Amino acid sequence: MSGLIWDITERKIAEEQQALLAREVDHRAKNALAVVQAALRLTKASSLPEYIAVMEGRVSALARAQTLLARDRWSGADLRTLLDGELAPFLGSGQRALLDGPAVMLPAHTAQPLAMTLHELATNAVKYGALSSEAGHVSVTWTVEEMPSGVMLRLRWTEVGGPPLSSPPRRMGFGSRVLEGTIRS
């Protein structure tokens, strides 16, 4: 009598890891698509070309966050790198943004909402705020505070040199909803 025994433990572990990775990718893809769907529904524009431009900017912000997360294998995202990526399309070659704060690795689940928030702030600064004026600039500072419930990131977006604010906004647009949702989480 003879027999042959194969230890398939390593293969089973690899299969389980592959299945876990597939579920994680599926989950992240569904989350990203949900964000795109919300942006499609909530984006307002006066013309189709304007709508397309706004949506391309929002999808690009989401893609930049995805790329940053994938580069670090979804372990998190460096805040300064995220800020650089979101501000670069709006700043041109001039020194129009000051970034100041400690090194912060954002948890993966916060990188995309924060990227969308920063994109909306930068877009509004270009349209209505400091970056709509040649003399204007943006300052983004942040600190990290230890709280009983965990660590809290305090991020301050300050615009200087923009046009005076004539009146408060009349409606809550997609950007405001993104900001509100990000702040709550």
Feature-to-residue mapping (PLM):
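Short beta-strand/loop element within the Bergerat-fold HATPase_c
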Residues: A135-S149
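PAS-associated C-terminal cap
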Residues: W6-Q17
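ATP phosphate-binding glycine-rich loop and adjacent ATP-lid/helix-beta elements
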Residues: M152, L165-S185
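Short beta-to-alpha transition helix within the HATPase_c
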Residues: A53-R64, L68, S75-G92, T141-T143
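Conserved short strand/loop->alpha-helix "switch" segment adjacent to the catalytic nucleotide/phosphoryl-transfer site
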Residues: Q17-A22, L91-V138, R170
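Conserved phosphoacceptor histidine of two-component systems
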Residues: L20-A34, A38, L42
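Sensory-domain boundary capping and coupling elements
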Residues: G3-I5, Q66
